[in-house]
Amino acid sequence: MLALPWIHLALLSFGYGLALTYGHLGWLAGISVALLLTAGFAARQQHVRIGRYLGHALFIFMALALAMHWLPGFYNGRGINPQRFTDDAVRFSMYLNLDKPLIGFWLLLVCPWIVGQRSLRLGIFATAMGLTLSALLALGGALLLGVISWAPKWPDQAWLWLFNNLLLVTLVEEALFRGYIQGGLSRHLKHLPYGENLALLLASLLFGLAHLAAGWQWVLLATLAGVGYGLAYRFGGLAAAIATHFGLNLLHFGLFTYPMLAG
């Protein structure tokens, strides 16, 4: 049995504690927790194969519902009120979510294999490679499409944005898209000659489609960025994918229009 990824769990728990200082949980949130526990028990047991499949199916449904904020009992606090970080940017606001991080807790506790432990040296190399590629593809593409421009800044709310993005956004998204989806597909497609490449591309495409509400440009850019994150995960594990994703978000936030140009 794989050891639990305590460092990842500790970081996510710290972020969740930060979110609780801005929002709160209602008793109805207990229903979601109970369903996740049921899914986890079913997915972890080894006696009934169909039970494992049903457990993962229930988790996928819950992950979608939590990510879309469909479930009751979660009162997410707003950490940043609507404002423009630069005069030419669209207004940005930020909530510290209490529902979406439960996806990360479930994955780290039920599927610790998603971590893909690698050496520190390999992780650093994979992060540097993934970040360089994703920055060239995604930020370069965003500049070419005219959705961002050069706009270096460090607003007063930057530190809160940083903690939220690292602990509650990037960690959870990479655990889901790279660890669970790419890692799971890689395991099931390993008999194919290009199974790992196909898993990476499918996970990147799903990650891009998750940004559909922002427009086709962001679907394309997120898909391209996902290729860099996926390579970081393949060679450096979950920590490298998180570092790559967060590094790109930090470059976008600190050096370019955030979140995008108005109009």
Residue ranges and their predicted role:
Residues M1-S119, F253, T257-G263:
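N-terminal, membrane-interfacial amphipathic/helix-forming hydrophobic leader that caps
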Residues F74-V169, R187:
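Juxtamembrane helix-loop-helix connectors linking adjacent transmembrane helices
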Residues T132, L136-G263:
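Transmembrane helix-loop-helix hairpins at the membrane interface
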